[in-house]
């Protein structure tokens, strides 16, 4: 038993849990031990860590072990089973050399990272180590800066420890990382106003940071102006639904976006439209003091009706400039989060019409959610939880995206690290990507490859299909097309 071992490369999101390979779990763990915890130890510490085992996953206690050993994306961990549920863990760097822990371990690991010529080659906002945001008035008022969820998740940033913000000239400011328990948002507070003043950043300005040091104290470098441009069409912008935007029923519009589209002086009304064509009319205001545009009276209703919560990342596209401006809500895909603009807001009230409209849409949303649950239950008995029935809407086809039922993904151990392929009735495979589309409920969605898959199977909008889950490897699975399904839901 002492020679049994397995290894795992660490991927984005590894702090939440670690999945034990299926083959190792079936051969060495399942049915052998009644205990629900494992003991982990390493040569770096005399501490023995107790970690909860939930099925094939290491959960409670794993995050503390990972943080204590400064594990990062790209590292490899090797588990050697010593006895029963006791494991010795060896940590390897991306070069597959064992990580040496000591007084200078941070410097040694930093040198190892710098040996990779591609480590800091990219400077655009498409680089996962970068993020762009705008200086919201409330961020100056409350002296804090929020980190986009996508950036935090991709780089394994946690809400504790130290972080240094460095400007282009090398001058640095020290901060303590914090995290909001309610929503998991990571932020820094105290000193943000000083940083902005020293670097000429004003309300409405867009800035871009690049993570240049991960080991020990994190270091973010402010990139030159102009580096914040992302791959989005100039008629688009990405926004973060900050808690204050909902509290004050207001959303600030990026100065750069308004200026590039020649609408930075406009006032009056603005229409927000969702993917289904339903519209909301909001007030468009211009702050003369700073030249910042904002929309108010109806923003909260729009978010409520479209299932947007605090921390959601959304993309708008300006589809009409003449007359009343129209912003269309686009599909919210995680790859665009790296250029998210963390908009926060000032106080303004909601009108009665928006509130009534919100209540009406919430009722419709609840009816649809209940209907969706009925569809899932029809095909998810304990003996066949590998099957799932999905109803296709016009939006799913248009955006080539589809959400998966939460019970289905949880029962089958599907997560963001899972590689998924779609298999049509002709035996052809279609690649798709699993993305987290609802951060609070941990709901996953399939993005890409979906449109071609349904066309190959002759499926049209508003039809339902049954798929079968087939695991190929530990983290690789296939959703196989079984048949079309007629659902009679009353």
Curated annotation (Swiss-Prot):
Keyword Nucleus on entry: yes
Iron-sulfur is among the record's keywords: no
DNA-binding segment(s): 3-95, 130-226, 236-333, 387-484
Compositional bias of kind Basic and acidic residues: 352-364
Main location: nucleus
Domain of life where this protein originates: Eukaryota
SMART domains (UniProt xref): B3
Record lineage: Eukaryota, Viridiplantae, Streptophyta, Embryophyta, Tracheophyta
Source species of the chain: Arabidopsis thaliana
InterPro entries xref list: B3_DNA-bd (IPR003340), DNA-bd_pseudobarrel_sf (IPR015300), REM_fam (IPR039218)
Pfam families named in the record: B3
GO terms assigned for molecular function: DNA binding
Region (Disordered): 343-367
Protein's recorded name: B3 domain-containing protein REM14
Subcellular location: Nucleus
Keywords: DNA-binding, Nucleus, Repeat, Transcription, Transcription regulation
């Amino acid at each position: 038993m002492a020679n049994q071992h397995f290894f795992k490369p660490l991927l984005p999101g590894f702090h939440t849990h670690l999945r034990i390979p299926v083959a190792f779990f079936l051969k060495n763990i399942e049915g052998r031990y009644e205990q629900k915890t494992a003991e982990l130890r390493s040569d770096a510490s005399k501490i023995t860590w107790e970690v909860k085992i939930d099925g094939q996953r290491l959960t409670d206690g794993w995050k503390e072990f990972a943080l204590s050993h400064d594990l990062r994306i790209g590292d490899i961990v090797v588990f050697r089973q010593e006895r029963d549920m006791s494991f010795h863990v060896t940590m390897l760097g991306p070069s597959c050399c064992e990580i040496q822990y000591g007084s200078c371990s941070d410097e040694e690991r930093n040198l190892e990272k710098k040996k990779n010529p591609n480590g800091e080659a990219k400077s655009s906002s498409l680089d996962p180590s970068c993020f762009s945001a705008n200086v919201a008035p409330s961020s100056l008022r409350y002296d804090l800066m929020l980190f986009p969820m996508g950036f935090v998740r991709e780089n394994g940033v946690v809400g504790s420890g130290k972080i240094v913000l460095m400007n282009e000239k090398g001058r640095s400011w020290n901060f303590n990382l914090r995290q909001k328990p309610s929503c998991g948002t990571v932020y820094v507070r105290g000193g943000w106003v000083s940083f902005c003043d020293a670097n000429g950043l004003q309300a409405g300005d867009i800035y871009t940071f690049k993570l240049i040091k991960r080991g020990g104290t994190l270091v973010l470098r402010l990139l030159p102006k102009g580096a914040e441009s992302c791959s989005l069409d100039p008629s688009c912008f990405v926004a973060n639904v900050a808690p204050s935007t909902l509290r004050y029923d207001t959303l600030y519009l990026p100065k750069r976006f308004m200026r590039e589209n020649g609408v930075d002086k406009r006032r009056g009304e603005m229409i927000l439209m969702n993917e289904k064509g339903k519209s909301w009319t909001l007030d468009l205001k211009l702050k003369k003091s700073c030249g910042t545009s904002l929309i108010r009276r109806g923003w909260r209703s729009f978010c409520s009706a479209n299932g947007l919560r605090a921390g959601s990342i959304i993309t708008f596209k300006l589809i009409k400039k003449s007359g009343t401006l129209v912003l269309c809500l686009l599909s919210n895909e995680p790859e665009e989060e790296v250029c998210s603009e963390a908009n926060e807001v000032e106080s303004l009230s909601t009108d009665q019409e928006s509130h009534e409209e919100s209540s009406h849409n919430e009722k419709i949303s609840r009816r649809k959610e209940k209907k969706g649950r009925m569809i899932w239950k029809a095909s998810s008995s304990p003996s066949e939880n590998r099957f799932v029935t999905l109803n296709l809407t016009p939006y799913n086809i248009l955006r080539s995206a589809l959400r998966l039922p939460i019970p289905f993904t949880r029962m089958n151990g599907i997560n963001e690290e899972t590689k998924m392929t779609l298999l049509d009735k002709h035996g052809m495979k279609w690649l798709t990507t699993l993305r987290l589309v609802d951060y609070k409920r941990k709901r996953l969605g399939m993005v890409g490859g979906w449109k071609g898959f349904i066309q190959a199977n002759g499926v049209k909008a508003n039809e339902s299909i049954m798929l079968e889950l087939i695991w190929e490897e530990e983290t690789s699975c296939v959703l196989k097309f079984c048949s079309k399904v007629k659902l009679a839901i009353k």
